[in-house]
Structure formats: structure tokens, C-alpha cells
Amino acid sequence: MEQLYNSTIAAISTAMSNSGIGIVRMSGPEAFQIADRVYKGKKEKKLCDQKSHTIHYGYIVDGEQVIDEVLVMLMRGPHSYTGEDTVEINCHGGVYVVKRILELLIKNGARPAEPGEYTKRAFLNGRLDLSQAEAVGDLIASQNEYALQSSVSQLKGNIKDKISEMREKILYHTAFIETALDDPEHISVDGYGETLKKVVDEIMEAMKRLLDSCDDGRIIKEGVRTVILGKPNAGKSSLLNVLLGEDRAIVTDIAGTTRDVLEEHLNLKGISLNIMDTAGIRDTEDVVEKIGVDRAKEYADKADLILYVIDASRPLDENDAEILHLIKGKRAIILLNKSDLDMQVTKEQEELPEEFPVIEISAKNVQGIEELEDTLKEMFFQGELTFNDEIYITNVRQKTALQDAYAALERVNDSIAAEMPEDFYSIDLMDAYEALGNITGETIGEDLVNEIFSTFCMGK
């Protein structure tokens, strides 16, 4: 920890590829002084003497050699991202240029930043809580509008505020019980269990709402695990190609062309899909194809969504019956493909369960795809997600901490129901308090903090 506050770190904050602009960032007590050793302005002015939140035009130099023409941004702590003195050098974005400037800063007293160290310093300096720090990583990694908005909501402190509210209530009642136990002559806890239960139930209800958001949260962050199922030659690979907008899967008239799982990522109306094209479901003596069929069933069992493609130009058979049995009770959409041909299967077919939406499509003619997209969006997010009041837990670590806190409050209610001594309430209340603190980082261990930030990119 001592090294953290006594050292000045430097890293490249932009992508390591040739581009118009590159940014090299420094943070720490010597940031301005190190910058002065390599910066030369037109008026020979020292950066150390300049005001915070100002931008200065000049050159980065190594002795008499000019390295690049730059704009240098100054931010004095605590009014910076890290809470420390920060310098951002905006240079030309050539890979060699930014690396050369970074090497020059290190030569003049900075040390290379560890992965995620800027955000880690922001957390340790109180600029962000841990849920907000994790939101920074999620924001950078977001692949769709929902993931972006969820990360922004968390970065604004929505989770922090909700968790802090719960912790304050728990701490208040824990403190009251502890005080009463220490001074029973002046403070009575007779009948307090009933009062406490109302508060605990209220907090648990708020926790349950957060826990109920976890499935949607995972889908927002990671995408919908989607499996395309159907018999051979039903048009599964054609559908994948249409959704991707490119010929990714091989399409032929030969049954059994797809023998393994082909996985791709795509966005449909703001929703990320991790979509898998699988081998056609049928009885087969071919050993390799049979492995593919078994794997298709295995993936379907773990899927968030199944797109069951039926060749509607042919009657249903025993293989369709097997697939319908396979998807029973799951989240699925039935797609009647080849609607441009004489249809032998219709939406009204009695074999098709009413629990599933049924859509007529033609992968060949790109018909019905928009209806599929709308149905998918409605199926997962009731047509729209809002981030004004709703909070979505997208982080497994946060979910686990919430579950631990919820279990602790369940124990409090059990103790109240069993009329246990009040000190039992206090123990479990503190367990809940500390579990919630793991979400915001107020009660988390240093090793876990290091592990979390090690997953960040170098310049963040």
C-alpha cells in the first residue's frame, strides 16, 4: 500500500495500434515534475506552476531531440480520476511514438502501471466504490446498448446508493441492540424482535428484487446463449448466415453438413446473442454426426433461448417430436422456415405447443426476420429496458455477496421466530452488513481487490 501512494505510474491509455491520437497518462505525487523533465512549451513555462484542468501545447523532448508535438492536460488531486495529480499527454497515435513517450517518462522517474491500477487508485482514494470501479471495466467491455446503459447506471452510483441504504439500516439496529445489551438498565429490547423483523423483511425484499435482476443482468453483460436446433436441411445454417449478414456457415442440399457446433456473436436490436448453429437432430449411424447430434442436445440443455427451425415444406415426423420434447419447458421460438414454398406445417398445427411463439420465415428470401427480432426483445426484456430506477446485477461477485447477506438476514428472522437472545440477532446482522460491504468494497480483503483490478486493461 505504501508503494501505491509514494510512486508515480505511467501507462498508454489508448489502443496499441496506429491511429490519429494516442494518450499516455501519469498519476502520482511526481506526475507534474516528471512531465516538466520531458515537456518543452513555447514560453518555457513549467507545468508545475500551471493551474489544474488546463491544457498546454508544446513538445515532448529527450534532451535536445524532439519526440512529438503534443497537448498536455493537467489535473491536480483530489480533483482527478485517481484522486492524485494526473498528467495526460495527447500525442500522435503511432505505436512507436506512444511507446517512446512512455519509455521516456519511466526513464525520468515514473514506473509502469499495473493492469487496472488507475481505477484501483481511484477506489483506494475514495473516488469510486468497488461497484463503480467494476462498472468501469464493464463499460469498456460493453458490446451492446443495454450493457452500456447498465454500466453507466452502476458507474453513477445506483448500486452503491441502494447498498449503502441497506447497510445504514442494518448498522442502526445492530448498534441499538449492542447498546441495549451493554446498558440493560436504561435501554430495553423487550418486544424489539417484532420491530426488527419488519425492518429485516423490508431489506430482504429489496435484496430479492436485486437478486431477481441477476438473470437479466447476466444476459445484458454476457449475451443470450442461443442455440439453433432442427432437423438436417431445415435451414439452420441459412438462418445463422442471415442473422450475421454473411456466409459464415456452409449451406448445401446435403443433409448432415453441420457436424459440430459453430458459435458466433451478434447484436439484434441492442441484445447480444451468443448464437450456436448445431448438427441436425436425427437418428444416424454416422459416428461423427452422432457426436454432433449429442453435442447439440447438450448445448440446448444449457441455452437461454432455443430457435427451433422447422422445414415447413415437409410434414412433421418423429425427429420433430423428439425436438419438441427436448425444448419443453424451455425458452424457445419456433421458426417455420421455407414459407416461400408450399407449406405443409402451419402456425395452427396442433403438434406445436401453444407455449412457444411461432413465426413464419424464409431464410432464403430474408422474410420474417424483423418479427423474430421483435419477439426476442419482448421475450427477454418485455420490449424495453429502463435504467432510471431499475438496477441490474451483472456481476457474479456482487450476486454472491447479496446471496450471503440475504442468508444472514434469514438467520435473523429464524432467531426472532425462535425467540433467541438478542445477541444472536446482532451476530447475523453484522454478517449481512459485512457481506453487503463486499459489494461496495468497504469490507473486502486486499487480495480480492488486487484480483479484481488485475483483470483491467493496462491504461485503466
Residue ranges and their predicted role:
Residues Q3-I12, M16, E145-N267, T284-D286, ...:
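C-terminal-of-GTPase-core extension/linker across diverse P-loop GTPases
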Residues H56-D68, V72-R76, G256-T284, K302-L305:
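Switch I (G2) and immediately adjacent beta-strands of P-loop GTPase domains
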Residues R111, S272-N274, P357:
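Conserved beta-strand segments of alpha/beta enzyme cores
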Residues I275, V309, L335:
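Generic enzyme active-site microenvironment
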Residues E289-S313:
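Inter-motif core of Ras-like GTPase G domains
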